[in-house]
Structures are given as structure tokens and as C-alpha cells.
């Protein structure tokens, strides 16, 4: 099975799972999804794959689903709920390397076989961790703000696609630029640096455009009383 086909399958699985979290757990399900997706995406990003002829990291699809989760909260609930979800994701993102770094400080036993693998996955690279954290918090809060700004200018279900795509496409660009600049600028030739920015953004932008039916489904579930709030 090709990586490209797997990418589309993963997209459908991730975004469908997000809707199931929402349908059966309501608003709390979206909060849980943001925390879970943030942690898993930051583990997946360690793996580099070839996708559509370019090198890319895993985690882009799951990371993009976080923006859909906050968009659903912005659309069906309040700006405060969306901002809270973004903050939950940020805390999860920061907690993961901190807690795993502490775990790695323990001296492994004679029969241990996991230390090297854990070091590979969770060994802290300050620029990468810092870049991820700054990019996440800036892009997420911009996403929440811009969604509500567009909603105030273009309300109504017919403009839902514009609110979702308009806010996310700009926010994902901010995310890609900030992360790549902090994590990689000066480490690679200028051409390679911009290739990283471009390919990362294009994958995230593709997810943003493809997730439009999912936010309409989330709106339908909410307005027709199919969401089980906890």
C-alpha cells in the first residue's frame, strides 16, 4: 500500500474518530480529543516519510484535526470553550517532554531494553520543543480569534466553509512559519528551509480544505440533537 493511499486513509480515520468523540461525548469529547491528538501528533512527528514525492513528517493529519476541534467549539459553543481547548492542548504539549525527560533520567536496569528507543522518541531538542510550543499557542489562538472575527462578518450556515477554511488556512501558515523558523532556521540551506515550510504547510492546508464536510456534519449533529453532552 502506498504512503499516499495510507495518508488518505489516516485522514478519514482521524477525522471520523473526532466526530465520534463529539457525537458520544459532546464538548468534553472535543477537549479530550485535543489533549490526545496533541500528544500523539508530537510522537508521530519523529518519523519522516516520503509523500507525494517529497519528505514529510507524520503527525500533520492528526495535528490538523485539532484545528477542526476548536472550530467546532467556536461554531457550536463559545469562543471561551475554543480557547480553553487550545490551552489544554498547549499544556499537554509541554507536559509530554517534561514528564518523559524526567523518566529518561532514571538509570535503566540491567535487563532494560527500552531506554534507547525512549531516548530517540522523547530526547528533548530544545529548538524543536520550543518551536512546537510557540507555533502551537500562536496559531491556535489566532485560529480562534479569526474564526469569530469572520463569523461576526459572515454569519449563517452557508458561510460555515469560509469561517472554517479562512481561519485555519492562515493559522496553519503561521504555525508552519513559526515552527520552522525556531526549529530549523540556520541549520539547513535556505532552499531546504523553505522546502520544509512549503511542504509542511501544503499538507496541513490540504487537511484544512478536506475537513470542510466534517464541520458541516458536526453542525448537523449539534443542531439536530444527536450530540450527547456529558
Short names for language-model regions:
Residues 87-110, 132, 136-140, 144:
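Transmembrane alpha-helix/helix-exit interface in multi-pass inner-membrane proteins
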Residues 150-162:
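Membrane interface segments of multi-pass transport proteins and intramembrane proteases
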Residues 102-127:
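Membrane-interface interhelical connector segments
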Residues 8, 31-32, 61, 86, ...:
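Hydrophobic alpha-helical transmembrane segments
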Residues 168, 176-185:
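A structural feature that tracks compact, well-ordered secondary-structure segments
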Residues 39, 89-90, 133, 137, ...:
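Transmembrane helix-bundle signature of multi-pass membrane transporters/permeases
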Amino acid at each position: 500500500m502506498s504512503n499516499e493511499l495510507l495518508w488518505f486513509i489516516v485522514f478519514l480515520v482521524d477525522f471520523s474518530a473526532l466526530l465520534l468523540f463529539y457525537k458520544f461525548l459532546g464538548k468534553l469529547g472535543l477537549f479530550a480529543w485535543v489533549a490526545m491528538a496533541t500528544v500523539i501528533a508530537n510522537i508521530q512527528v519523529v518519523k519522516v516519510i516520503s509523500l507525494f514525492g517529497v519528505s514529510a513528517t507524520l503527525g500533520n493529519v492528526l495535528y490538523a484535526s485539532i484545528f477542526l476541534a476548536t472550530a467546532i467549539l467556536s461554531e457550536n459553543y463559545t469562543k471561551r470553550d475554543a480557547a480553553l481547548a487550545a490551552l489544554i492542548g498547549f499544556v499537554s504539549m509541554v507536559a509530554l517532554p517534561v514528564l518523559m525527560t524526567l523518566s529518561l533520567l532514571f538509570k535503566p536496569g540491567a535487563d532494560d531494553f527500552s531506554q534507547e528507543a525512549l531516548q530517540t522518541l522523547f530526547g528533548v531538542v530544545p529548538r524543536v520543543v520550543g518551536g512546537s510550543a510557540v507555533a502551537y499557542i500562536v496559531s491556535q489562538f489566532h485560529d480562534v480569534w479569526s474564526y469569530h472575527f469572520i463569523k461576526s462578518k459572515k454569519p449563517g450556515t452557508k458561510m460555515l466553509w469560509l469561517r472554517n477554511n479562512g481561519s485555519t488556512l492562515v493559522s496553519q501558515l503561521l504555525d508552519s512559519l513559526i515552527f520552522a523558523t525556531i526549529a530549523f532556521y540556520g541549520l539547513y540551506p535556505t532552499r531546504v528551509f523553505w522546502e520544509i515550510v512549503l511542504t509542511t504547510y501544503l499538507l496541513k492546508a490540504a487537511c484544512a480544505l478536506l475537513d470542510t464536510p466534517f464541520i458541516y456534519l458536526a453542525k448537523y449533529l449539534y443542531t439536530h440533537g444527536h450530540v450527547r453532552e456529558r
